């Protein structure tokens, strides 16, 4: 199921999402003294990252990781790691602990997908709070509808938290949280922007439709997803 939150502009949506995520992190900190946040990459989250980085939280007890990552060097322009380091791990959030998916210092030829997944799994901590995005094809994290590993990514019986995925419609091999790992996250948020993505979301939210991976999140009985939307 999901709860819809709509805002007049992207700045308002980013600030409201930062408020909600900070509240969820504070709840985890109060309950167990620590919290783990997983975020998504791309250009859309930058305003949200900036707002969240200024929140008054006990950041030294917060771990920050990714919902998914491109298997590229962490200094590559397409690296989500680099994006988070630049826009989120700053201001007050600079004190947070980074939980890596891809090892620093590796060249592209040194980054073999299976080894990257093994490395990410060694560092993996189950998130308390997760912020997802959604592509125009309905993918979320790096669970792509036509990827050869799609079934593995959505099959919860194996209890696997991270998988290697190969997008057919996007560049770079990926490492991604699985549907099972997403469903085991206490607080799940989805940020979408623009009429085109809203149209995809509206289609994906109807019934059960594996053509849109986000549908599997929205209809998962273990997930209560808060959707933040602005044109």
From Swiss-Prot:
Q: InterPro entries attached here?
A: 6-phosphogluconolactonase_DevB (IPR005900), Glc/Gal-6P_isomerase (IPR006148), NagB/RpiA_transferase-like (IPR037171), PGLS (IPR039104)
Its EC number(s): 3.1.1.31
CDD domains, per the entry: 6PGL
What keywords were assigned to this record?
Hydrolase
Catalytic activities: 6-phospho-D-glucono-1,5-lactone + H2O = 6-phospho-D-gluconate + H(+)
GO molecular function per UniProt: 6-phosphogluconolactonase activity
Kindly list the residue ranges recorded as spanning the membrane: none
- This protein's record includes keyword Hydrolase: yes
Top enzyme class = hydrolase
User: What SUPFAM superfamilies does this protein's entry cite?
Assistant: NagB/RpiA/CoA transferase-like
Q: Which GO terms describe its biological process?
A: carbohydrate metabolic process; pentose-phosphate shunt
Pathway, per Swiss-Prot/TrEMBL?
A: Carbohydrate degradation; pentose phosphate pathway; D-ribulose 5-phosphate from D-glucose 6-phosphate (oxidative stage): step 2/3
Q: Which Pfam families match?
A: Glucosamine_iso (PF01182)
Q: Main role?
A: Hydrolysis of 6-phosphogluconolactone to 6-phosphogluconate.
Please give the family membership noted in the entry: Belongs to the glucosamine/galactosamine-6-phosphate isomerase family. 6-phosphogluconolactonase subfamily.
Stated name of the protein: 6-phosphogluconolactonase
**Organism expressing this protein natively:** Neisseria meningitidis serogroup B (strain ATCC BAA-335 / MC58)
